[in-house]
Each structure stands twice: as C-alpha cells, then as structure tokens.
C-alpha cells in the first residue's frame, strides 16, 4: 500500500500529463473516482487510514508534530496488528507522522523494518523532492532482499510528495530574486527547525514545464458567503506559515503553482516506478495486491485557497484510490460509488483473510463488492471531521467542523472558538467555546448541491428561504454523529492523546 501526501483526485490534470506508474495501476486495476478522506490534516487522516476509525474514535485531532499535539495511541489497533495476527509479516517504510518524534516506535504500532527520520519527512520545504527517492529505494530494497519467502507480507510505504506544494512559491529560485527580503526572513525562521536537515529551504532543482493556461473554475470565489474560518485561515497561514505571497491579481503565479503541483506528482511517480521495478524483478505482480491512495488533497488556487485547511471542499477531500488485486479486480475498470478512507482498512483486512466481524474497531465498509460490480452500493454518506486551528488567530473563529456528503448534497457545520495547539504543538490556551454540542445558532453552516454547483460556489445555507432545510440537515448530521461516534462524543477530550502519553 503506497500513500502519497497532499494529492487530490486526478481529474484536474491536463490530458496526457505523463504519470506512467499511476497509469499502470489505473490500466491494470480498479479506480475509485468518488473516494474521500475523512479529515483534511495529515495526521488525523493517516490515523483513520491505518486504524479504520473516525477522528472521534482514534483521537488524533491535529498533526502529530509537537509536545501538545495529539498522536496515535500505542493502544490503537492498526492494520499492522490485525495482519500480524493473521500471520503476515508487516513492514513500513517512509512517512508515518503519527507520533511526535523523529523515531516513532513502529513495533508498538504493529510494523517492522522502519528506518530513517520521520521528522525530516513531516513537510518542510523540499522534503518530498529530497526524500521520496531514498524512501522508494528502501522499499525496493525490502522487496528484493528482505521480504519473507515463507509467509505472506504487507508493506506500507509513505511517500512525501506532492506535499512540497505547501512551500510554493518561496521554494522557487525565481521568487527569491523577486522578493529577496521575504526569502531571507523565511530562511531565518526555518533555520530554527532542527528536524534533521542541513537546509530547510533548498531551491527546487528541476525545470517546471508549463501546462496550465486557465485558472480553476472556482478561483474567483471571494469566500464572503462561506464560513469565516476559510478567510481567516488563509490570512494567518500566509502570515505564520510564510510559503510566499501570491497576489490574487497575478494570474501567472497561480498558473505556475498548478504547473509545480503537477511536476511534484511527476517526481513522485518516478519514485513509485522504482518500487514497481522491484516488483517486476521479483515477479510480484501475479500474487501481490497493490493499493495506492493519499491522505488528503490541496486547493492549489481553487476558491483562491492554498494547501489543505479547515474546510471540506472537493479539492481537499476527494482523493485517489487505485487497487490492483490479481484475480479479483478487472483491468481498466472504475467505479463512482461513494466511498471513504475509513473503508480502506476494513478492505485491506478482509483481503488479508481477517474476520472483520471480530474487529470492532474497524468502522468502515468493505470495498470488495465493487471489485466485481462497479455499480454496487457501499454507503449512503461519507463523514468529514477536523478540529485544528493550525495558526495563531484562527482559534478566534469557528475553526472546527463536521460534515456529511451523500453524493449530491454536502452539509457542514462549523463550531469551535478557543483551545487547540499551533503547528509546532504550542497550546493557544483556554478551552473551546461553542463545542461539538453547541446550539444551531452558534454554528457557521455550509450547504452545497454538487449536481447543480459542482465547484461549490453557492453556499445554500446563506439563503433565508432554506433556513428550515439547514436546520433539518443539522439535526440529521448530529443524529448520524451520535449513531456513528457514540453520544458521548461531545464529552470526548479535545486533546486526544497528548504526545507524552505513549509509554510502554
């Protein structure tokens, strides 16, 4: 199972854009075109991916980066544990990002053979470009020399790109020339991050070909009918994250950003090819199930937003999933069935022979019915959740959200104000006001009809004539949350598992 970072579903790419190794999976397996992450930040999404649990259950509400950020508990039952109990040798290579340390205790999480510095892969500028190749080489070497010959095995690989888009344009040499003072300021700030690298702001070393000539269809969204946190987060991210200033009127800098995002996919695809070369050399395709997905997407200019953040737009939440299962999937097939990250762990466990009915922590539905019937129905609704203010100043607005999407209508409620930690684990102080159980009127609301408005420009929740409908959807979501997460979810600790709680 290969997991990229910050990769959205591929329909935004120009026709003919060369990603041959992803295309190899598409041509030889089943593509899921309506597959969603559960949470927009990296660590909460990865916790769902490897446990099959929702954020409200695994407790990872923020990126596992600093001492106060939550991390995945050693007591969590992961795919590593489930498959080990089934007789599998379970190994992990690359980015984990679920424990706030350079050397996570992967054996406690059910995985062997991990090596490296996880902290270096969390996402500073250029980390995907620098480290995806050695991670892929580790994985290829494992396939050639380490994998067992006398038992089944499961290898999970966490690559970093296209996450480097987080640092566009300040990682581009042409931007350094444009604004040398800003570049020097960012370099000085990043020099204080002792995360195992000699240079925390390297120049992107490759030429970026120009493919894009048009901005996203929803680029001109002014966000004034959207929850306040969308505007606030962008302002504070640009202030504190310092990825480079992008003038809204400078069309070219946004188009170059799309070109760069595509280029990062290409570099990552070459590294996936290194892993596939090892599979070719060891004749592994005939009896190996191969899965590719990502943790979340990236806005890359859609709604004039950058990165992933406290929202549930398609560009961030809809992500790739390709499965090649010899004898089970049909080459070149696709399904638009509504599916979600929480389903993948259940599917992997089932494919490995685990009796998923005896794994109560697996909360998703198996995707295997779609292997033979791409029109099969798996679920009625996917659920979204995130509770991280990220940057100073964001905690002053309703930054947390929970949402549901039924394939046509997407409804999200925004709550919060107060509490939380920043991106390096420093608490903002105070407690969350207007929490999960806050009154309808203490929320911001979103409602989109994606059949009529596929680019999510018209927030129907702002229409006074739909107030009763929004109240009804709010009540439906709250009832679904209680039924799915448990009614005591509203009292569950916002801190999740603090980074110093994992002690064996």
Give residue spans per PLM region.
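Bilobed periplasmic-binding protein-like "clamshell/Venus-flytrap" ligand-binding domains
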Residues: 34, 150, 477-493
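Short hydrophobic beta-strand that contains or immediately precedes a catalytic carboxylate
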Residues: 447-448
